[in-house]
From Swiss-Prot:
It comes from Chromohalobacter salexigens (strain ATCC BAA-138 / DSM 3043 / CIP 106854 / NCIMB 13768 / 1H11). The gene is hflD. NCBIfam families: PRK00218.1-2 (NF001246). InterPro entries: HflD, HflD-like_sf. It holds the Pfam family DUF489. It is a peripheral membrane protein. GO terms for cellular component: cytoplasm; plasma membrane. Belongs to the HflD family. Keywords: Cell inner membrane, Cell membrane, Cytoplasm, Membrane. It is found in: Cytoplasm; Cell inner membrane. The keyword Ion transport does not apply. This is High frequency lysogenization protein HflD homolog.
């Protein structure tokens, strides 16, 4: 993989929101890839996991590894949604469901605190084994199951039943869902709101198109 240069974080609030929302849809696309094929885009996966483990990033750009191309899968997926091009209904459903799940999480202070505490412990695991080691992924998946999946509102993942039941696949899917909620929280922190999406659609499309040119 060719390394990409570190970029400064975008100054535009809408661009930051677009990148954070692209992270949500990158997670949605990865969930769909795993559920249907058992494999996923490695760069997209690594970016999502590292962003979730880094609970105290130095900057906005640090969250996604310093270059927006680390969110390329999410940018392309979100662009298709915003431009009403052909997009997988399952991926759209996962993406917007992750935003809904984030909203429920924000209302539960105890769960937010628990997530933070357990992520700190999982960071220690990652330092020992590596960010994407299966022990770390298993812990992230268990964290999702113990917290976010206890809400009455749940995300139902559809795909190949034999793949979804294979070794480590439930953990990988749950870990990917957790990363999507992490980016949904980032989107909210940057001023993103569901009710604004309709009004900001053109601005988000413009921001995503500008990212395609760099």
């Amino acid at each position: 993989m060719t390394p990409t240069p570190i970029q400064n974080a975008p100054q535009s609030a809408v661009t930051r929101q677009a990148l954070a929302l692209a992270g949500v849809f990158q997670a949605a696309a990865v969930v769909d890839q795993l559920a249907r094929t058992g494999q996923c885009d490695e760069r997209a996966w690594n970016t999502l996991i590292r962003a979730t483990l880094d609970t105290n990033p130095d900057s906005f750009a640090t969250i996604y590894g310093g270059h927006h191309n680390n969110l390329r899968l999410g940018i392309d997926t979100l662009s298709a949604v915003m431009n009403r091009q052909h997009s997988d209904p399952a991926v759209m459903r996962y993406g917007f469901s992750l935003v809904l799940l984030m909203q429920k999480l924000r209302k539960d202070d105890a769960m937010m605190a628990s997530l933070g505490e357990r992520l700190t412990r999982i960071q220690g695991q990652a330092e020992h084994f590596g960010d994407t080691h299966e022990n770390v992924i298993a812990s992230l998946g268990q964290l999702y199951q113990d917290t976010l999946s206890t809400f009455r509102y749940r995300i139902v993942v559809q795909g190949d039943p034999s793949l979804l039941q294979s070794r480590m696949m439930p953990e990988r899917v749950r870990a990917a869902l957790l990363t999507g909620v992490r980016f949904a929280l980032l989107w909210h922190q940057q001023g993103g709101r569901r009710w604004k999406l309709l009004f900001q659609r053109q601005g988000i499309k413009k921001s995503l198109a500008a990212l395609d040119g760099h």
